[in-house]
Regions:
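C-terminal and inter-domain tail/linker signature
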Residues: 1-257
């Protein structure tokens, strides 16, 4: 809508004691963190639309379940910005927001066609958009990684190798305020797997991916990135019920020998 609408975003963890079963996940009786990100559209002083994302596999792993076979990067409870300045309750310099949005757009456009053989090697391409000490706070199933070289090794390279065709479906919200910005789509991408992703076999048919990206800019480049991917929905399109497989809920009993 030409950046005419107003959106407010919140991201972090909901903390509590996991004392009751949830989605078939057995309680632990211990503290647990539910990673979330929400986008709220504001009209006439009231919320008119909300998009709410939860990293449910992240909670499952804290509860002792292993919903995925392997992770290429680190599993941890993800902190807020290194600069501890992510809470913005006052007006920000519009010029800083414009710089952040420009950095995000440059990165997205620079990687738009990852099959182009004439492009730079991956690490060199990433250096055009990212600071060397970048941190990529990825979702459960992939994990978090630090520095451009490790990001290329532990996520960006394997991700690009896992898919062939990529269709960009657009964003429902894309914004920047100060040194922070982000976007989400429903879905953002349609991808065709090449045969394996996250250590699991895939079928070569187009599937949708719902993604949230939140960024922090430092200087002229991006330096932190928090990612949410709806992997329960993603794998369900491949015929895999991650919740049922990890918890046993809804799974048919195996026939007797």
């Amino acid at each position: 809508d030409g950046f005419e609408s107003v959106w407010v975003t919140s991201m972090g963890h909901l903390m509590g004691l996991f004392d009751n079963e949830w989605l078939g996940i057995a309680p632990t009786g211990k503290m647990i963190f539910l990673r979330y990100c929400e986008f709220n559209k504001i009209e006439h002083g009231k919320i008119t639309e909300t998009a709410m994302f939860f990293d449910i596999p992240h909670l499952m792993m804290q509860a002792g379940l292993q919903p995925f076979l392997t992770q290429t990067a680190a599993h941890l409870v993800q902190p807020g910005p290194v600069t501890h300045d992510g809470l913005m309750f006052g007006e920000q310099d519009p010029k800083e927001g414009e710089k952040t949005l420009a950095a995000i757009d440059f990165m997205v456009n620079d990687m738009r066609d990852w099959k182009d053989a004439k492009k730079l090697p991956l690490v060199e391409e990433l250096r055009r958009s990212w600071n060397e000490d970048m941190i990529w706070w990825g979702p459960a199933g992939i994990g978090a990684t630090y520095t451009i070289e490790r990001y290329a090794e532990q996520h960006s390279g394997p991700f690009r190798a896992a898919f062939t065709d990529r269709i960009f479906n657009g964003h429902l919200c894309r914004f920047a305020e100060g040194k922070f910005g982000g976007f989400f789509g429903w879905p953002n991408l349609t991808l065709t797997p090449t045969g394996e992703f996250m250590g699991m076999p895939t079928k070569a048919k187009p599937i949708d991916m719902r993604v949230i990206d939140m960024y922090r800019r430092e200087g002229s480049k991006l330096t932190e990135n928090w990612i949410f991917i709806d992997f329960l929905y993603f794998w369900n399109q491949q015929g895999v019920d991650i919740l049922a497989r990890a918890t046993g809920i809804g799974m048919e009993d195996e026939p007797p020998n």
